[in-house]
Structures are given as structure tokens and as C-alpha cells.
């Protein structure tokens, strides 16, 4: 994942649900998705890191707040509207880490994976309770 950071300036600020003057992207992948959301006429509104979802960390057993990358409301081909929560992650962080010689790295990757799984479980539950969808998009989904 490319770690380009900055402030996104939307062409269509009225589509943004939040402060359109402070839309932060934390990677070139997020920037790419923001451009797509801003330009796509089927996107009714979108937001970035605006919704906190509580989850219990498997690392410290404390409740934390997860801010998903995007919340999107789109108009489908059938005319119905759908709300989705989207998370952008490298595919490597969506799979159980494989033990390697570097134990410290394996421990860190395992912790990241465990925390991500719990965040995504909480987001999926939140979405099901609200009639929304939850998706994790990787570089393959983004065509990178």
C-alpha cells in the first residue's frame, strides 16, 4: 500500500456527509476511492472516517472505537438505494499471517490481523443491524 497522505478537495462537496474541507486520505488507495466516490453519479453521498463503531480489542480486552474508511450511499441499477461501509486494506492484512523466521514481525502481523478481524466483525454486525452492507476492498478490488 502506498502511504500518500493529504487533504482531499472534492469537486462535489455537497455529496460529502461531513466537513468537506477536512477530508483526510491516508494512502493513495484511499485517495483513488475518494476520487471515484466524488465523480460517480450513482453515489448519493459518502463520508470518510465519520462513523465510530465500538469493538473489543482481542489484544487488551478494552473497548475501542473503529472509524471505517468510508460510508457510502449509492443508487443501484434497479433504482433502490444501498448504504455500505467500505474498508481499504492490503490483501496481506486480510489473511492469517504465516509464521516466518522473524518472530517479532509474525507477532505484530498476528496482532494486526486479530484486531482487524474484530473491527470487521463489529462493522459487519452494525451493518446487518441497520440493513447495510460491509465490504473490505483490497488492491485486487481496486485494480492495483
List the predicted regions and their residue ranges:
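Electrostatic, structured charged patches in enzyme active sites and in nucleic-acid/phosphate-binding
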Residues: 1-144
Amino acid at each position: 500500500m502506498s502511504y500518500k497522505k493529504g487533504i482531499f478537495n472534492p469537486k462535489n462537496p455537497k455529496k460529502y456527509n461531513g466537513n468537506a474541507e477536512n477530508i483526510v486520505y491516508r494512502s493513495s488507495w484511499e485517495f483513488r476511492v475518494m476520487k471515484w466516490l466524488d465523480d460517480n453519479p450513482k453515489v448519493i453521498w459518502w463520508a470518510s472516517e465519520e462513523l465510530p463503531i465500538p469493538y473489543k480489542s482481542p489484544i487488551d480486552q478494552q473497548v475501542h472505537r473503529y472509524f471505517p474508511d468510508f460510508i457510502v450511499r449509492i443508487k443501484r441499477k434497479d433504482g433502490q438505494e444501498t448504504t455500505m461501509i467500505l474498508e481499504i486494506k492490503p490483501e496481506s492484512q486480510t489473511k492469517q499471517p504465516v509464521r516466518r523466521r522473524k518472530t517479532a514481525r509474525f507477532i505484530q502481523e498476528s496482532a494486526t490481523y486479530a484486531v482487524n478481524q474484530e473491527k470487521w466483525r463489529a462493522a459487519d454486525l452494525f451493518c446487518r443491524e441497520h440493513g447495510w452492507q460491509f465490504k473490505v476492498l483490497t488492491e485486487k478490488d481496486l485494480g492495483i
